[in-house]
């Protein structure tokens, strides 16, 4: 099977969302023909890695977790030409904007199933993903709740299927109004990496409490620091991760100094390969995150045999209870949280070891091998159902691109949509027989309102690219 995956994050960036996108592509490439389309320093196809995965890079700028792609006419044409040549059976995007939107247009024109994994709760999209990592107040402010809802509604309507990570995500998508096909397929992990972790020695006087993730308001480390005030001094809180926004780590450090806490260790971001060794030394993994669709680090903690104490959220509700740690309500006080941590750390060795074993069993089915099988089955079902592009779909696509600013990008997309509507056979074969030197036809339709934010996509990407490049990005 030939699959084109799309992510807004380079390898090693974007937190759990970026990590799972690249890991999924790498795992797929072991048995399938796969390309990952993602930000890069230059636009073009890069050599494959040891698994056979190829990277098609889209020129982007930015030195943080998120890089802004420069969706110029040249870039869009290069991406379309590559997809025409690769001719994937399925296009699978992890984000509903920018590169993902361009990939969706190509898939619809070519009658190729388009799948989107929803890593966010649609009603709270601005609190997740790329916007969480952007340090660009102007762009963040432009993404109002109303606009983001319209974007998602229209993007979802052009998907052949959505993937929900769990039942809470499925419920959220249905509540949002999506009535199309949804597959429930969880995030995968390489469980073998954590299977060898030894359980922490519960008899040790010093107890290590670990949290792994970005330092951010959503992750709610403030609450963990407040809980630390109610724990003995030999309970050490280790915060592994970097701040998403400048000054946030310093804010947390000031809070520690105000409370006189010397037992909070800001360990910073560490290579993901070192996470198992940190979990192995942890007596409890703690989480006060306000929202987590399906947290990779909670899965990894459980896979390592580390009990979890957490405040209620989508992931904690799904995976954590008294058999593997403790789940508290959102309204629980920091003192109550601390009491639960101390209770777990005070268990007799045999009871603590039982928690550790239960934790491993809780996530035993979340290995990548199982996730890949579920995903392949979903793809095959979609391929069987996929019909040729209809006139209605073609009209919808024209409405989509008509909202783009006048210029070469809009003309390219309009031309190719119209050609796909006229030719019932393979678009790739059809394009090979047509002269691409013909001047692109002018747009004939009045701008529609179907995709309110689509027009801003190209503008925002180019403006954002220039802003980020102006911060000191190297030139080619």
Residue map of PLM features:
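Carbohydrate-associated surface elements
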Residues: 168, 188
């Amino acid at each position: 099977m030939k699959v084109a995956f799309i992510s807004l994050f380079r390898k090693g960036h974007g937190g759990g969302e970026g990590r799972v996108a690249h890991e999924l592509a790498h795992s797929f490439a072991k048995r399938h023909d796969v390309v990952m389309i993602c930000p890069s320093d230059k636009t073009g196809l890069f050599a494959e890695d040891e698994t056979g995965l190829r990277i098609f890079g889209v020129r982007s700028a930015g030195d943080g977790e998120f890089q802004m792609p420069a969706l110029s006419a040249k870039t869009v044409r290069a991406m379309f030409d590559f997809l025409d040549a690769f001719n994937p059976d399925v296009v699978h995007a992890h984000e509903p904007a920018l590169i993902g939107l361009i990939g969706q247009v190509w898939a619809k024109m070519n009658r190729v199933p388009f799948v989107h994994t929803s890593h966010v709760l649609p009603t709270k999209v601005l609190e997740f993903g790329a916007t969480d990592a952007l340090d660009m107040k102007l762009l963040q402010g432009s993404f109002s709740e109303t606009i983001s809802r319209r974007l998602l509604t229209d993007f979802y309507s052009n998907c052949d299927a959505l993937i929900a990570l769990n039942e809470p995500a499925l419920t959220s998508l249905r509540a949002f109004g999506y009535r199309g096909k949804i597959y429930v397929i969880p995030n995968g992990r390489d469980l073998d990496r954590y299977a060898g972790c030894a359980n922490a020695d519960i008899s040790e006087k010093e107890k290590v409490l670990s949290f792994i993730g970005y330092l951010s308001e959503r992750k709610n480390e403030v609450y963990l620091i407040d809980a630390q005030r109610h724990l003995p001094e030999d309970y050490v809180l280790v915060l592994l991760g970097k701040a998403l926004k400048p000054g946030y780590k310093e804010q947390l450090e000031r809070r520690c100094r105000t409370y006189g806490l010397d037992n909070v260790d800001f360990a910073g971001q560490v290579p993901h390969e070192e996470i198992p060794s940190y979990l192995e030394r942890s007596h409890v993994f703690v989480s006060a995150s306000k929202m987590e669709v399906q947290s990779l680090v909670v899965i990894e903690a459980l896979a390592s045999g580390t009990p979890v104490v957490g405040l209620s959220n989508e992931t904690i509700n799904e995976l954590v209870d008294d058999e593997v740690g403790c789940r508290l309500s959102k309204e629980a006080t920091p003192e109550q949280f601390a009491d639960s941590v101390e209770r777990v750390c005070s268990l007799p060795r045999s009871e603590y070891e039982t928690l550790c074993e239960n934790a491993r069993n809780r996530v035993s089915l979340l290995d990548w091998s199982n996730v890949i099988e579920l995903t392949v089955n979903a793809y095959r079902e979609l391929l069987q159902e996929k019909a040729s592009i209809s006139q209605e779909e073609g009209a919808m696509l024209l409405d989509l691109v008509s909202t783009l600013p006048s210029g070469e990008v809009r003309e390219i997309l309009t031309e190719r949509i119209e050609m796909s509507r006229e030719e019932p056979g393979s678009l790739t074969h059809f394009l090979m027989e047509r002269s691409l030197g013909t001047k692109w036809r002018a747009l004939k339709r009045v701008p529609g309102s179907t995709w309110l934010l689509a027009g801003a996509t190209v503008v925002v990407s180019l403006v954002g690219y220039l802003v980020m490049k102006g911060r000191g990005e190297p030139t080619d």
